[in-house]
């Protein structure tokens, strides 16, 4: 949740977009501004999970996206599927790609490998800490660059799944994600009124059926 005590939660009300479903799994596209799971306060209950639960009463969330991040979010329809998907994520056999707009010219390919830890004095911020942080790795690939706005479009592939990993790693290498009010509060030159980070791709072998699944979402920026 944002650090600002004056934060008012106003989640988007458009229906969730269903992008994949089988006997065990359901995958939706979460809009930016919607929590993945309910918050502690009554006014923070509206979330992707509760909306999915209304249609699939046994659904379990398998991973999360930050409120400001949009994109592909997967749920298990029942307990056996939840356990199987959890093992799949632990084994790192799921491929996830994100598209982001970042400040500055970032071209070529590279890897960010710096450990992360919660910044307890400024929660929910995370920070780089080489002594106490947990290992975190992110691959990046520059896709294009807009010289007029000084903004690059990049493909991000998280190898690990630390909280705020992509956001902190991009900030660390000097290319913060545009619109990120937590890690890049300066006025961004992007015309977007949101953080430019979208979970665009998910690929895995369905753990119960053995079917190869590849899901591509529509990037809204």
Language-model region placement:
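A structural micro-motif recognizing beta-strand termini
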Residues: 103, 156-159
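A generic structural motif
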Residues: 143, 157, 205-207
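Short, solvent-exposed secondary-structure boundary/capping segments
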Residues: 149-156
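RNA pseudouridine synthases
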Residues: 1-137, 144-148, 196, 221
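Loop/turn elements at beta-strand to alpha-helix junctions within RNA-recognition modules
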Residues: 79, 159-160
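Pseudouridine synthases involved in rRNA/tRNA modification
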Residues: 1-25, 31-35, 148-149, 163, ...
